[in-house]
Amino acid sequence: MSIFGKTKGTELEKTIAQLAQGEAIGGAMYYALAKIAKEKFGLDEVAKEFIELGNQETNHGAFYAMLNGRYPSDEKEFWQMVRGLSKAEYKGENNVEQLADKLAQLGLDEKGVAQVREFALQEKHHGEATKAIIEKYAPKEDFDDKPRYVCKVCGFEYTGNLENEPADYKCPLCAMPKTAFEKQ
């Protein structure tokens, strides 16, 4: 039996949403602690432990998001999200490169700037990887005649009629409201 959406519309929905967000933040916190432990104090084993805790927290957050039906379970919507995510990842490369330039101007050391530039390359890789998944597994669809909307915050691309989505629709990538999208 699927856990997807079991708490959506129930008295637990708000609590589960808070747990999902808290676990996601907790995952990022443990990853940051791992970097600090390794880079500042040379504690490689402590860093490994924190990375494992971060992985667990991230997994917990995903579970709670599933309980609330946060991401699409319909196959068409699933692949639409993957396509939009892929395009956002490609756009992320340029955005993160620009961030690296600004950080360099602010005086971030070369090692830090290089790390951010590596993140930009990883964003590009994420775009390439999701594109390869789409090409290999997704049903073929013609999107040429469908309207496209792009989230102004994260670059997620929605294909189809956004007006058909409920008023409380949120970007599946950054959780911004429907009003954050611009028609292309």
Where are each of the predicted segments found?
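Non-heme di-metal
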Residues: M1-Q184
